[in-house]
């Protein structure tokens, strides 16, 4: 408790480092964050001409570090598995592609509360986020810490954290295919989940225009999920 109070004092009295912010996030919810999560995800893709396409996914997470996405209908065998900082893409229950991938939204939205602080820091450094660059700003009327960029810089890869709740709310980064564009990912509509929090909507914008929206329903936390759901060798295993 004393250590947590000292850390809060540092955050309040002086500009924190990115390490301070990560440690504060971890310590605030130590032993309180849910270990599993499942939900139905309603997707809306918006094309540049304004037309939309809708889809449904089912997702299961075992935290830290494991996420299973099943494209509906589940028996299609299509989906994606994230585990051990790797991405497995499945088509008709067969692995089509495997690649190394640190999922930044998993790290910042979930794993940060359960992984050791040093592991989170190491993963963020591998994602090329400058943890020494920190400033304060306001987002949706609430004060936030911005880690990874200087004031006024909305191009460099950076993440935003609600200063009071210590939850991740925003990620900005150059586009992966076109680095002249800016990707803006927002965790919206936070709601209590026991003693923790859950964002029930995630928006993906490109240069200020929404291109993908995820809305979560049938949300369940700390439900028992079998290990087979997250084993790429046993992808056909499905949860009901």
Question: What is each PLM-predicted segment?
Answer:
Residues 2-12:
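Sec-dependent N-terminal signal peptides
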Residues 14-96, 128, 132:
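N-terminal mature ectodomain segment of secretory-pathway/periplasmic proteins
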Residues 59-63, 84-87, 104-107, 162-164, ...:
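A short, sequence-level motif marking secondary-structure junctions
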Residues 63-69, 89-91, 109-112, 169, ...:
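Short, surface-exposed linear segments at secondary-structure transitions and domain or protein termini
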Residues 139-236:
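Gly/Pro-enriched, hydrophobic low-complexity segments
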